[in-house]
Amino acid sequence: SQAKIQMGYELSAMQEKYIKINNLQVSEKLSNFVNDELLKNTNVSSENFWSGLEKTLDELAPKNKELIKFREDLQKKIDDWHIKNKGKEFNLDEYKKFLLEIGYLKNEGPDFKIETENVDEEIASIAGPQLVVPVMNARYALNAANARWMSLYDSLYGTDVIEQSEDSVSERYDPLRGEMVIKYGRDFLDKYFPLAGLSWNKITSFAVKYGKLKVLKGADIFDLEDENKFVGHRGESDNPSAIILKNNNLHIEILKDSRAFAAQQDHAGISDIILESAVSTICDNEDSVAAVDSEDKIICYRNWLGLMKGDLKSKFEKEGKLFERKLNPHRSYISKDGKGLKLHGRSLLLVRNVGHLMTNPSILLSDGSEIPEGIMDAFITTAAALHDIKNKNNSRTGSVYIVK
């Protein structure tokens, strides 16, 4: 209930130990995190950070209250309208006119062009899945960041994309289902990367010759219908361990390893097809997490900092074994012109900041009231992104993406 939530916030505030920084009361734990971890190896001093935050709060905290009050006023007017018109036939034109009058709707303006610069291709030109993950959980955040490249074979075998009959159900590996997975993968290649005069179902090998993909059926050689879809390979050109193709700015990697278990049923020795999948991920500080005090917020901020620095790790135990999860490296290939080629190994990470409504006891204003949590998020998450702007492991254009 709302009362319990409020009580939780009050208890959190009572448990905080504060230190005075200028006119702010800052949680000692948060202050230590910012000064010792967040700002380390950046060009921002702790003095500039805290004075800048205070100056921003002086200007925007009152504005934040005004916006919340405006929203409350809008909601009351809308509630009153519905009460007044209860039981009447709904008239869309009248309702729209009312919403325009109170400022809830605005008349559409003239056409405009987005002029934002330094936008990564994952935002500007690649259409692909976007994940949302609670940044408070390091393991989940790492899983999402690493979901840029995923196995098509695993995805097909372990889900109901391919219907599983009762006769083929087995706790052990089901070779019949394995054949269906391979068939699905070949049909997928035929659909998006068709060969001139041959189905992928009938190939026996592939190689790279003079910067072009050559697909073999015995001694016969075939080409892609669209040779521009071939991007590069890994391994020896005569017997590559992987080839990389591209369609609609999304890559797939065809792995060849005749020794792999998955390749035992495959007459071409293909062991898997890896799809470029979650091209971006929102690391969420709001709806999917419950961070009510400095201790909670530091967990969120520290995980985001680790993602931006590229050193976030998570250890966990599964079936009696200890595992460590970390960020995947970038993927290296040989391009079709014989040069080195690197592709991004993980999702482009965005960070979602808390909205206007919530406050947090991690920092108290000069009047003793709690800081608007969204402003605190904005300062700390962007400060964390300074580490990536310098190294460009997440955004290759030197940008940080804030979801509000």
Whereabouts are the PLM-identified features?
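N-terminal amphipathic/basic-hydrophobic helices that include classical n-h-c signal peptides
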Residues: 1-13
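Catalytic alpha/beta active-site cores
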Residues: 12-17, 94-97, 101-404
